[in-house]
């Protein structure tokens, strides 16, 4: 089974994914906890490319291609092999985040995101939990924890307006 958690930054996706993995492992299930962007060595390299440096160095289209490449590597090297081995895969983010942030917040590129997903990924989660919360609260929590993902806060704020 492939389970994903989606929601804005600071909504508790990582915490809830970890709690679910711990709960299932405590009941004897073999689980794999992962994240996007990233989750495999190649996808982590792409994550660094996107998160570090000048945020305007990539066009929206190039960024979509990078995220799709990272997801493809993640799918090939971790998700599919784990599912094939009978494990439950729990991911902090997957394609819905790309559909929202790159597909809508950086222009009307949803069609491109969907086409690339169909061609290169071709998999949807079996179950997605969407964590809904006040955007201001989530962003405040994300900023308070720090880390290297401030690069997307502006895009995420714009996405909240679109929603």
Question: What kind of region is each of these model predictions?
Answer:
Residues 13:
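Conserved lysine of the Walker
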Residues 98-163:
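A glycine- and Lys/Arg-enriched "phosphate-lid" helix/loop adjacent to the NTP-binding pocket
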Residues 3-5:
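Hydrophobic anchor at the beta1->P-loop junction of P-loop NTPases
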Residues 27-121:
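ATP-dependent small-molecule kinase phosphotransfer cores
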């Amino acid at each position: 089974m492939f389970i994903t958690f989606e929601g804005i930054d600071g909504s508790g996706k990582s915490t809830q994914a970890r709690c679910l993995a711990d709960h299932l492992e405590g009941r004897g299930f073999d689980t794999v906890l992962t994240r996007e962007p990233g989750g495999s060595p190649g996808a982590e390299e792409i994550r660094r490319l996107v998160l570090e440096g000048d945020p305007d160095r990539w066009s929206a289209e190039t960024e979509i291609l990078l995220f799709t490449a990272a997801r493809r590597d993640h799918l090939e090297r971790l998700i599919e092999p784990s599912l094939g081995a009978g494990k439950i895969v729990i991911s902090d983010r997957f394609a819905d985040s790309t559909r929202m942030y790159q597909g809508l917040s950086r222009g009307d590129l949803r069609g491109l995101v969907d086409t690339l997903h169909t061609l290169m990924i071709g998999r949807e989660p079996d179950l997605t939990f969407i964590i809904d919360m006040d955007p201001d609260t989530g962003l405040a929590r994300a900023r308070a924890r720090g880390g290297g993902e401030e690069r997307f806060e502006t895009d995420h704020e714009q996405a909240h307006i679109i929603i």
